[in-house]
Amino acid sequence: IGFNRRFDPNFAQLKKSLDDKEIGKSELLTITSFDPAPPPVSYVKTSGGLFRDMMIHDFDLSNFIMDELPVTISAVGHSLINPEIGAAGDVDTAVVTMIYADGKIAVIKNSRRAAYGYDQRIEILGAEGLLQAENIVENSVVKSTEAGVLSAKPKYFFLERYMSAYKAEW
């Protein structure tokens, strides 16, 4: 298929829970997909751009979760991180809103920079509850003190984050 995220165990469980009507009818899907750092501009020039190279995986995941194709799509993006990416004709930060035939909404947020690691989350609001697939982190220890709360960072990049999805797909 080439779209491995639907094989991620956490995303697959979220989809199963949705299909099993555990939160009722879906209403609002939010997909967050932030890379830890932008690619080299030389890559950007040949990649097809953020929408075709990066967000395409989120388009597939959204349509897989919603079980249909959208009827309306709107997008906005800008080059906020590196002006050279903009000069190459691409954006590094974007939001897409997709409306489905029955009125469900999907919002996809992409950025080429998240200083804290590879941020990959899904949240879906239903008529009877909320499903969330959170980041896969380096470890699950959370330290809480009077100074604040500290936890591990997300996995660094897609190979580490989606290793189990690649294995499940093949």
State the predicted function of each range:
Residues 32, 76, 125:
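Alpha/beta-hydrolase-fold catalytic nucleophile elbow
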Residues 1-40:
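A contiguous active-site-proximal alpha/beta segment in oxidoreductase catalytic domains
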Residues 16-20, 45-48, 125, 150:
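Short, hinge-like loop/turn segments at secondary-structure boundaries
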Residues 26-29, 107-110, 133-135:
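Beta-strand scaffold of nucleotide-dependent catalytic cores
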Residues 38-105, 111-116:
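Rossmann-like dinucleotide-binding domain that binds NAD(P)(H)
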Residues 10-11, 58-59, 167-170:
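A general structural signal for well-ordered alpha-helical segments in protein cores
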Residues 4, 86, 122-170:
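C-terminal glycine/acidic-rich active-site capping loop/insertion
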